[in-house]
Amino acid sequence: MAQLPGAASGSPAQKPPLPQQIILSEAKARFDAAANAEIGLVERLVWFWSNHFCVSADKDVAMVGAYEREAIRPHVLGRFADLLQAVESHPAMLLYLDNVQSMGADSIAGINQDKGLNENLARETLELHTLGVRSGYSQADVTNFAKVLTGWTWLRPEEPVHGGEFVFVRRFHEPGDQVVLGKRYTEVPALKAAIRVFSQSYSAARWTDLRPWRRSAIRIGSPARRQCVDVGWQAAGA
């Protein structure tokens, strides 16, 4: 039998690195769940929302499977606001869109370091995750929401206290109130409040609620029926 160059005769196959083992295990679990699902719609929704709220394996390959399992799957049959909160606060999303390094220019950490605001998560949340393109938000809204997001980060697992958790680090946070889409947000509670407002907006309903139905070959049909979907979305608290 032909032998690979440099391979020792009779030597056992080497295991892939641990991150690759994790992603292979997560992928197998994902496909097994889809293959054995009694109701296929749930798996279709998991795949749809994982694509809508996509992250990259380039930043941390070992987190991708956990992200879908922890942030997406538990919420596909629940409120969009809860799904959005879980997604935007997951370590995989914070790493992917660089919010772990974002800090306000006037924050304690920002004044003392040559680092500053990162708008990636704020822009993606408004443009792709909730309101959609050409929905009326401005660059000022993106910048101010990025300031709201400062301080919300993830501590690496080796940290002795709260390691691996989504936490608020005040020394990174831009002080003061921020106005986003005409609404004023005050300091620390602003993140959850802003996400709730975005998720319940008419633009978010139009941008996100119809997409799963289009994917599943169910046609919304008339504008009146489409309006019913939008109204139902908002009445349910998104």
Which residues does each predicted region cover?
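Active-site substrate-binding loop specific to GH73 endo-beta-N-acetylglucosaminidase modules
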Residues: 5-13, 63-238
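N-terminal accessory alpha/beta regions
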Residues: 1-75, 107
